[in-house]
A protein has these predicted regions:
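Gly/Ser/Thr-rich loops at beta-strand to alpha-helix junctions
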Residues: 49-52, 107-111
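Ordered, amphipathic secondary-structure segments that act as subunit-interaction surfaces
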Residues: 94-106
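Divalent-metal-activated hydrolytic enzyme cores
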Residues: 10-41, 76-83, 95-96, 111-173
Length: 173
């Protein structure tokens, strides 16, 4: 694996993970996970990045490594018509043979009831310069639509599915 950490120096937790990885590679622990890049079930799943879903979602769906393309983000939503989620779906469809897309949500999602104003205040409290936030707003970034969560999980999933179904670059077949 190739890895770079965002922080200036690795935390003890990251160092522990990297040490584990070195042993994992040395002992060839990866061999049981070897597969190719094409999903066997020809399915892409858009879901939330919630840590509770890491092992639970594959177990609940009966999928294993190599079965599907998993795309995860906060809330399992599409926040931009030409952002990274749509790009990932296009790559999955046109380059990796995906034929079906599932959108999966879960209860007690952290993106549910998320409010942009609260997040902007947390950013400022962590040292993000208010001038940068203002500059991004001036450049056309609508923080409210970008950072706000959703109030109704089912409505959010239906909206995301509708967005995908009607996207001009997603094939209708």
């Amino acid at each position: 694996f190739l890895y770079f950490c965002v922080s200036k120096q690795n935390s003890a937790m990251i160092e522990e993970m990297l040490a584990y990885n070195r042993e994992f590679v040395k002992n060839e622990g990866y061999k049981e996970y070897i597969t190719n890049k094409y999903p066997d079930k020809k399915i892409a799943i858009l879901s939330c990045m919630d840590t509770r879903l890491t092992a639970l979602l594959p177990a609940a769906l009966g999928i294993k490594n190599g079965d599907v393309k998993m795309i995860k983000n906060a809330g399992g939503v599409i926040s931009h018509p030409f952002g990274s989620v749509i790009r990932s779906l296009l790559v999955a469809i046109f380059e990796l043979g995906v034929e079906e897309i599932m959108v999966i949500a879960h209860s007690d999602c952290g993106a549910c009831h998320m409010h942009s104003e609260e997040m902007l205040e947390k950013m400022k409290a962590r040292g993000i310069n208010a001038d940068y936030i203002h500059m991004m707003s001036f450049c056309g970034v609508d923080f409210h639509s970008w950072l706000d969560g959703f109030e109704d999980t089912e409505k959010s999933v239906r909206g995301t599915v509708d967005f995908i179904v009607h996207h001009p670059l997603i094939p209708s077949d």
